[in-house]
Structures are given as structure tokens and as C-alpha cells.
């Protein structure tokens, strides 16, 4: 019975920070990685059209199985613009424009001891005035439009605008993205994205 208590195992083992990206991820949720397959399937968000999978739209609802399946590739992101000035210190301002909370949870996971974003020189800030990048989560909502505009205007340059998850980039199942797609410097796929994908995208966003 005691052997099955996960928290006791954790106390004995202790918390270990992963060696990712020098080593492969220790544990990963497959249904947050690249989908590969063929054929036309019914997709509620049109993430699969003419047999082509679009990571920006996918909500990983699994309605495409068994025609499509995850293969473990965590690099489902697009970096349009990077900023090498942020290589030593990269401060992120999280902005929730109307998310369900899943992307928020995964973003904050990268600060946990398992992933430890500070070893990459990545930090959170609670004001856009001190931010190098804004990380937008959730789709477009009327109530948050003014707040988002003010946050973007308050950020000093150079700056990066990051979409975290399908809702921010394309609207997911809720409507439309928080910003027009072309306004994002970085788009991170997932519903929600996993911490490995987030860290990999942030590293590429600063030219690493």
C-alpha cells in the first residue's frame, strides 16, 4: 500500500530538475505533440484539410483518430521574429484574454523545479513595462480588448508578441484569436501546449 503513495515516493526521491534540452524529455504527454497521418477526417476546427495538419488550429480533441496520431515531436511552434538581445535575460508578461486556464497552468509549470525556466534566464514579470515579451492566452474577448491594447502599448522595444495555444492564435473552438495572426512574432501550438514545447519556443524566440 505504502509503495503506491506517490507523494511518499516523491519525498524519498526528491525534486530533480530535468536536463532538457541537453537530454530528451523525461516524460511527455503524447497528445500535445505533432500529429501525423493521412486522409480527410472530420475536424471541428478545420485543423486537418486535404490531409494536412495545422498545429495552430488543433485542439487535440482526438476526433481524427485513428487516421492521425501523435508521434512525440514537441516542436510545434512558429517563430517569425526572434530577438537575440534577450539571450541573457528574458522577462515574460502573461496575459489572459479569456482562456480556460489550461494554457495558464502549463505556462506556470515552466517555473516549477522540474523545468526551472530560470536556468535559461527566463523570468515572469507582473507589469508590461518591464516585459521583453507578452504571452497571450485565450481567444478574443470584448472585455479584454482595451486591457490588451494598453499592455502592448506599455511595453518598451524591442519586444515580442507570443500566442500560447490554439485559442490565442486562431480562436480554437471559441471564435477568433486574441490578435490578428500576423501580429504574433511567435505562435506556440497546443491545447494546451506542454512545458517542453513552451521552453523550446522561448529559446528559439531569442535566437538560441
Where do the language-model regions lie?
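Ferredoxin-type iron-sulfur electron-transfer modules and their immediate structural context
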Residues: 1-46
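Catalytic cores of enzyme domains
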Residues: 1-7, 15-17, 189-208
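Flanking helices and flexible, charged tails adjoining ferredoxin-like Fe-S electron-transfer domains
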Residues: 3, 20-21, 25-26, 60-132
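Short, intrinsically disordered, charge-biased short linear motifs at domain edges
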Residues: 28-33, 47-49, 86-90, 177
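Iron-sulfur cluster-binding cysteine motifs and their immediate structural context
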Residues: 30, 36-78
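Ferredoxin-type iron-sulfur electron-transfer modules in oxidoreductases and energy-metabolism complexes
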Residues: 46, 154-157, 205
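Intrinsically disordered, low-complexity segments enriched in small residues
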Residues: 86-93, 97-100, 167-170, 183-184, ...
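Cofactor-cradling patches in redox/metallo enzymes
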Residues: 105-107, 112-115, 121-200
